[in-house]
């Protein structure tokens, strides 16, 4: 039987009593991603709010959602009748989550979190602010494993190799460059958690996150070896052979923290903003943790010649699809039969006919009249007869990825 939002909140309260007086549920996953697989949409499940950014706080008596200005209208609409209050971030009258908890909880009480869902920086910041009020953070297992009936499974789609003719550099070349940068930082190893950084380093892609061609995994690079932590079912024979050729060791995703606890390395570079607290805390105490940005972000920001060619080619292909769509739009909309959803489908169809099309980088969002203000919501709404403007975003192709925003007046001339 489907639970209401109030029933879900009540179940969570029963779960954390009596040892915990509040629980925080963010929007992210163990890799601190902005966009996550359905398995980790816990904040959406507990609140009914479908935006990509937001944090829910449940106390024994109150429930609140903190989100940014992109989602104020959407959140107000979706939270109606849920018993969850909307807290609009960045407004002077809105308390921070830690200020809210400091005011709501008496000294000596506890706030529960899943350490896999918060960065090291976030945890340390919350601990500093809450400890000033004698409120402690308690690390808990994920309560959704018990409470969320029919929870979607962990991502199971297989990984695949991204062809070097598009990547421009081999996996071994990239790892060599990373090791060179590690020496400059006097680090023997580095732990990568960000999914885009792992995908770039290994030239591996996947379909684990909608519109994001990444593979849920961790990557450890030391002076002498590289270890990919990934669910076994995601490794096809082709991928296994490829990783062996690149001298990448494969370990089970679920064994990441166990492996780090036995790590035989004198030092490891970890980014406290991109590493979850649980993984960070699992490192062998004998291994010195060097806090800092992993070299991957800067290395992948420097485009090689093949990547630059790919950008140009992808822009040309998407430009052709866009021109065809605009021509169709001018003649189709005045008929009054097109909806925001049908326009979305038509734009997708024009793009899908282009060579090397690999899917959307962002679901097209078409907004007419008052829906133009709800530029973060994609859902089937009926467009009115006299459509005068549309807003939409762009797609991804195998050669490159980007986003396009347009406001159109019909007729276009």
Regions inferred by a protein language model and the residue ranges of each:
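Flexible, glycine/threonine-enriched loop-and-boundary segments that flank and lead into catalytic domains
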Residues: 348-352, 365-392
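Conserved helix-loop functional segments at active or binding sites
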Residues: 331, 349-357, 371-375, 399-403, ...
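Flexible glycine/proline-rich, aromatic-decorated loop/lid segments
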Residues: 80, 282-296, 392-413
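Beta-strand segments within the central parallel beta-sheet cores of soluble alpha/beta enzyme folds
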Residues: 339-342, 363, 392, 406
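Short, solvent-exposed loop/turn segments at the edges of secondary structure
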Residues: 51, 214, 361, 388, ...
């Amino acid at each position: 039987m489907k639970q209401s939002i109030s029933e879900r909140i009540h179940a969570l309260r029963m779960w954390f009593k009596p040892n915990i007086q509040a629980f925080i549920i963010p929007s992210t996953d163990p890799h601190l991603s902005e966009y996550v697989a359905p398995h980790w949409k816990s904040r959406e499940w507990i609140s009914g709010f479908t935006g990509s950014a937001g944090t829910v706080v449940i106390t024994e008596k109150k429930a609140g959602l903190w989100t940014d200005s992109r989602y104020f209208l959407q959140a107000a609409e979706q939270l109606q009748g849920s018993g969850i209050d909307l807290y609009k971030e960045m407004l002077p009258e809105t308390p921070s989550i830690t200020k809210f908890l400091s005011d709501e909880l008496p000294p000596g009480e506890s706030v529960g979190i899943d350490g896999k869902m918060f960065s090291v920086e976030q945890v340390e910041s919350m601990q500093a602010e809450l400890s000033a009020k004698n409120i402690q953070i308690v690390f808990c297992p994920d309560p959704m494993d018990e409470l969320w009936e029919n929870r979607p499974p962990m991502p199971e789609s297989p990984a695949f190799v991204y062809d070097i003719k598009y990547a421009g550099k081999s996996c071994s070349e990239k790892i060599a460059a990373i090791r060179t940068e590690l020496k400059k930082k006097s680090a023997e190893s580095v732990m990568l958690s960000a999914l885009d950084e792992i995908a770039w380093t290994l030239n591996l892609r996947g379909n684990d996150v909608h519109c994001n061609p990444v593979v849920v995994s961790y990557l450890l690079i030391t002076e002498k070896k590289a270890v990919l932590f990934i669910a076994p079912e995601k490794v096809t024979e082709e991928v296994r052979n490829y990783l062996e050729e690149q001298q990448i060791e494969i370990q089970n995703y679920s064994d990441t923290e166990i492996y780090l606890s036995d790590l035989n390395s004198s030092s490891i570079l970890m980014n406290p903003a991109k590493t979850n607290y649980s993984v960070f805390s699992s490192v062998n105490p004998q291994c010195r943790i060097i806090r800092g940005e992993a070299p991957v972000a800067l290395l992948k920001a420097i485009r090689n010649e093949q990547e630059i060619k790919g950008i140009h080619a992808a822009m040309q292909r998407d430009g052709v699809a866009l021109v065809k769509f605009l021509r169709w739009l001018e003649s189709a909309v005045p008929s009054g039969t097109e909806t925001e959803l049908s326009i979305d489908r038509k734009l997708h169809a024009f793009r899908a006919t282009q060579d090397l099309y690999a899917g959307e980088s962002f679901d097209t969002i078409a907004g007419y009249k008052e829906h133009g203000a709800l530029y973060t919501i994609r859902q089937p709404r009926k467009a009115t007869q006299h459509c005068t403007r549309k807003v939409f975003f762009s797609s991804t192709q195998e050669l490159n990825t980007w986003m396009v925003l347009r406001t159109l007046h019909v007729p276009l001339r």
